Amino acid sequence: MVEELGKVFKGKKTKKLERGVACPTCVSPGNLLMNFSPLSDESKTLKEGELVRIDLGCHINGYVAHAGTTIVVSADPAAKIDGEVADLFKAGWDTLQLAIRTLVFGKKNLDVTAMIKRSAEQFGFEPYEGPFSHKHKHHVLDETAIIMNKTIPDQRHHPFQIHKSLLFGQGLFCS
């Protein structure tokens, strides 16, 4: 990833831009939701059929980009995923797409949270408590402006309106 980042923005004015790996960059086995960071002497063998979340993050000039996906461990790359796991993947994808489409100028963060809840429930799933979508700023990964996957009565959250210059890292988790 560092090698590929070195190929980006190579002009005179931009070649000195800071760039590198960013959090989260990890592989989290199924029993851990995200950000697995084992000690150097720990190891874990992934098992056939286990759900695994892969997260990659990088930054250029202090702005983070990250991508994540969940896969099913399989020795056969052509193996089909079906049943509840396939439904969960479909629910996660469709719910994320709806959340992104709701994240528009004039809407509120709680509108996005409500859309996540409604969409996941249509598939018979529930958004996880805890993971948030954070507003990003220069050299700041998790700002105080958040979009919750699920409203939690005791959780402090600050409603705000979406405006044109906001940048969010959208994270979505369902069970």
Question: Each predicted region: which residue ranges?
Answer:
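Active-site neighborhoods and metal-handling regions in enzymes and metal-associated proteins
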Residues: 1-175
